[in-house]
Amino acid sequence: MNIYKEIDNASNWISDNHILFIKYISNIILSLIILIVGYSASKVTQKIIKNFMIKKNIDIIISEFFCSIIKYSILIFTIVTSLGCIGIQTTSIIAVIGAAGIAIGLALQGSLSNFAAGVLLVTLRYFRTGDYVNLCGVKGKIKTVQIFCTKIKTKDGKIIIIPNNKIISSNIINYSEELHRLMEVIISTEYTSDIKNVKEIIIDVLKKETRIVKEKKITVRLKNLGESSLDFLVRGWVYKKELKQTTSDILEKIKIELDKNKINIPYKQIDVNLKYSKEK
């Protein structure tokens, strides 16, 4: 008897509140649809961004981390929207999320600035893995660009780790960006040397050197009158990968040609005058 009464009461409630009931069920269904669509959108967006970053040769660690941020941002927005559809007040939830974000941001201010700088570095592509650079006064080859720092390998094999925010706020010198590098050396000769003859000899050496870029200007000029020498500035453009070896070979060839023409490279001389006094 009681069971029939309860069923009858439920039936009467549904009959009296069927519009509200249908609206509530509709909101639940809409909420579920939003969750499904939002989840699918997060996956698709993550995949698109990841493929884009792979094509741009962006570091895999950066791309995965950035994709995770996009994914969870979409999911949080989806969940909040879904809860709002079923009548839950989302204002307080948004306030809590905002407060938590501010607290985390203040606690991780340095790390977040490093991360933001890292994103800028890989996006703007100031340098790539393997480039020879000067970052914050440190010279070496780029080993990796990570989320919070960049690793550089120096000539003597040291691994230097530099925070990304320091890199982005200082001068970046990339020696690998251009195809050619400027070779610059100083050649010193005796004061008795014929200036015109010295310049002709050096220019002839540079013109015969196949690794010197002929399309660019060659410079040989008297730069300084030293304490015991005439100092000539010698400039020429070479391919960046051959800079060291070419510079060494050019110096050797110039020395040989100067010797052939009996033009000496001086060394510093010190005159010592000794004064003697007669003993009384």
UniProtKB/Swiss-Prot annotation:
Entry's Gene Ontology cellular component terms: plasma membrane
InterPro entries: LSM_dom_sf, MS_channel_1st, MS_channel_C, MSC_TM_helix, MscS_archaea/bacteria_type, MscS_beta-dom_sf, MscS_channel_2nd, MscS_channel_C_sf
Domain of life of the organism encoding this protein: Bacteria
Pfam hit, one: MS_channel_1st
Transmembrane helix among keywords: yes
Cellular compartments annotated: Cell inner membrane
A GO MF term: mechanosensitive monoatomic ion channel activity
UniProt keyword Iron-sulfur, yes or no: no
Parts of the chain that traverse the membrane: 28-49, 65-85, 88-108
Residue numbers on the Periplasmic membrane side: 1-27, 86-87
Annotated membrane topology: Multi-pass membrane protein
Keywords: Cell inner membrane, Cell membrane, Ion channel, Ion transport, Membrane, Plasmid, Transmembrane, Transmembrane helix, Transport
Cytoplasmic side: 50-64, 109-280
SUPFAM superfamilies for the chain: Mechanosensitive channel protein MscS (YggB), C-terminal domain, Mechanosensitive channel protein MscS (YggB), transmembrane region, Sm-like ribonucleoproteins
Main location: membrane
Quaternary structure note: Homoheptamer.
Stated family: Belongs to the MscS (TC 1.A.23) family.
Job description of the protein: Mechanosensitive channel that participates in the regulation of osmotic pressure changes within the cell, opening in response to stretch forces in the membrane lipid bilayer, without the need for other proteins. Contributes to normal resistance to hypoosmotic shock. Forms an ion channel of 1.0 nanosiemens conductance with a slight preference for anions.
Protein name (Swiss-Prot/TrEMBL): Small-conductance mechanosensitive channel
